Amino acid sequence: MSLDQAIPEALQALRTRFGAAVRAEQATGEAFPVLWLDASVWEAAHRFLREEIAAPFPLLADLWAIDESLRQHRTGQPASRITLCSHLVSLVRNADLRLKLATDGRAPSIAGVYANADWYEREAHDMFGLDFGRETRRILMPPTWEGHPLLKTHYARATEKPPFVLTDRLFEAEERATITDPDLLGLPKLRDGEELMVLNFGPHHPSTHGVLRILLGLDGEEVVWAWPDIGYHHRGAEKMAERQTWHGFIPYCDRIDYLGGVISELPYLLAVERLCGIAVPPRAQMIRVMLCEFYRIMNHLLFYGTMAQDVGAMSPVFYMFTDREKGHEILNAITGARMHPAFFRIGGVAMDLPDGWDAMVRGFLDWMPARLDEYERMVLRSELFRARTVGVGAYDTDTALTWGTTGPGLRATGCDWDLRKLRPYSGYEQFDFEVPLGQRGDIFDRTRVRADEMRESLKIIRQCLENMPEGPVKADHPLTTPPPRGAMQKDIETLIAHFLQSSWGTVVPAGEATGQIEGHRGLTQYAIVSDGGTQSYRTRIRTPSFAHLQMIPKIVPGMTVADLVAHIASIDFVMSDVDR
C-alpha cells in the first residue's frame, strides 16, 4: 500500500463501518486528515482503528482538549463547548489520523482501547474538567486545586487572583492531601496473607531523576506494584503559550525539556511555519539540524553517565561531563547559551554562524569517536553492567506501542521508527545515517541504542560541516523578518508594519497546524490553534517522557528495588518534560 493510498483507504473503511457517525472532515493545512465523530461511536471507532482495520493504528500519540468558548474562527466545525482530540499513528501506513469529538463537558473514555489513554484523560479532566464517565483523579495539579487551568475562564497570571494566604486550616488540608491511601487507588496491601510494605520512593530521591514520587508495594525487596505520582514540576507551559506572542514563546520551549536545548524549539516552529506558509532557507535548515544533533549528543552523554552511575559505576559520569563541557562550549559560541539557547526563530535562526565555528566543530568531531570507544569499553562491555541490565526491564514492540513509547525506548525493541528517516523535516532527507536498533527491548538495549545514536549524530554533524550552504539564515517573509532599515526610512507603511510587528507581535492566520520531530527522547509534537491573533489560542505540547513514565506499573512488578532504579534510569526522562 502506497502512502498516497494509505489514508484514503482507512477513511473509507471508517466511513463504511460507522456511516453518518463520521460527521465531517475538517479542512486544515495538516499533513493528515482530521475527522469529527459522534460521541456514540467515539470508543468503537478507536477500537476499530486499533484492532480491526487492516494496517491498524496501534499508537495513541496524544489526546487533549480545546476550550472553544472564545474561539471566533470555526467555519465548518460542529458546535462544541470543549473539543476532545485524539492523535493516532499507523506505523505500517506511516500515516497519522486525528479524531475530534464535540462535547458539552462529557466524553466517552477510550482507556479500555488504548491503555495509555488513562493519563491523557486524567490530564484532560484536570485541565478542562472533562467527565469521562469513570473515576478520574487529578494528575498534574494537586487534589486541593480549585478550577481547571486550561479553561478560558481560569486566570492565567497570579495578578488576576487575590493574594495567596496560607492559613493553618489550608496548611493542614495541603498536608493531608500528600497522604496517598493504596486502598483508594485499588492497590492491595496484602500478598498471600502477608502485609506489604508501602514505600514512598521520591519525590526527593536522587534515583528518580527529578521530583517524581513512586508509591511502591514491596514484599521484601520485590516490587509487587508501583504507582507513579507526577505533577510536582508542573509550570503551566500550555497556559503560558496563550499569553505570549508567537515569537515570545520560543524561550519557554527550551524549558519544556531543559536538556534538549533547541530540539524543543523545533516542533513548535515547524507548526507555526506550516500555518504561516513560511519556507525556511537551506542554510538555516542545516544549522537547525547541526544544532539539534549536538544537543542529542549532549543529552545522551548525560544519560550514558547517569545510567552507569545508577548501577554502581561511578567514574564514567565524570568523564562524560567533561566531554559535554566541550560540546557546550561550542553551543555557547554559536547560540550564546549552553542549555537554554532560544536560538531558533520563525523562519530560520537568530543569527548566522560565528567566525571559526567550523574549526570548533571539526575539533569536536575528531575528539569524540575515540571517547565513545572508551566509554563502550567502560560501560557496555563491563560484565557487571551487563549482569545488571541484560534481560532486565524488557518489553516487546506491541507493549511499547500500547503505552505510547517512542524514540530509543521503541527502537530498542527492534522497531525501525525514526521520523528523521520516515518523515524527513528540516532537510534530514539529505543526510546519510543509520537508525540503531536493539533486539530484546531491555535496559542494555536501550543504553546501546543511545550510545550508537551518538555516533550517527556525529556523522550528521560532519556532513553539515562539509556541506553547509551559503545564503540567508532567515526567511524573507513579513511575518518573521523585519523589513530593511533603508525601506523603513523611506516608506511610512513599512515603518508602521515594523512597529506593529515589534510591539504587538506577529499576526498568524487562523487555523490549526502540527509540528513533529524525532526528539532525543522520542516523538515530540506541538499542535497549535490560531484564532488570527498575535497569541496562540491553544498550544498542545506532546512530550515523550509523559507517555514513557505511565508504563512503569506495567514493567516493574517482580523487579527488585535496585532493578527498579536501573529501569527508571533507562527510560531517560526529565520531569520538566513530563509535567510541562
From Swiss-Prot:
Keyword Metal-binding included in the entry's annotation: no
Record GO cellular component, one term: NADH dehydrogenase complex
Location of the protein in the cell: Cell inner membrane
InterPro entries with a match to the protein in the record: NADH_DH_suCD (IPR023062), NADH_Q_OxRdtase_suD (IPR001135), NADH_quin_OxRdtase_su_C/D-like (IPR037232), NADH_UbQ_OxRdtase_30kDa_su (IPR001268), NADH_UbQ_OxRdtase_49kDa_CS (IPR014029), NDH1_su_D/H (IPR022885), NiFe-Hase_large (IPR029014)
Key words of the record: Cell inner membrane, Cell membrane, Membrane, Multifunctional enzyme, NAD, Quinone, Translocase, Transport, Ubiquinone
Membrane recorded as keyword: yes
Reaction(s) the record says it catalyses: a quinone + NADH + 5 H(+)(in) = a quinol + NAD(+) + 4 H(+)(out)
SUPFAM superfamilies found in the cross-reference section: HydB/Nqo4-like (SSF56762), Nqo5-like (SSF143243)
Membrane topology: Peripheral membrane protein
Region (NADH dehydrogenase I subunit D): 195-580
UniProt record similarity statement: In the N-terminal section; belongs to the complex I 30 kDa subunit family.
Subunit record text: NDH-1 is composed of 13 different subunits. Subunits NuoB, CD, E, F, and G constitute the peripheral sector of the complex.
Protein name: NADH-quinone oxidoreductase subunit C/D
Biological source species: Cereibacter sphaeroides (strain ATCC 17023 / DSM 158 / JCM 6121 / CCUG 31486 / LMG 2827 / NBRC 12203 / NCIMB 8253 / ATH 2.4.1.)
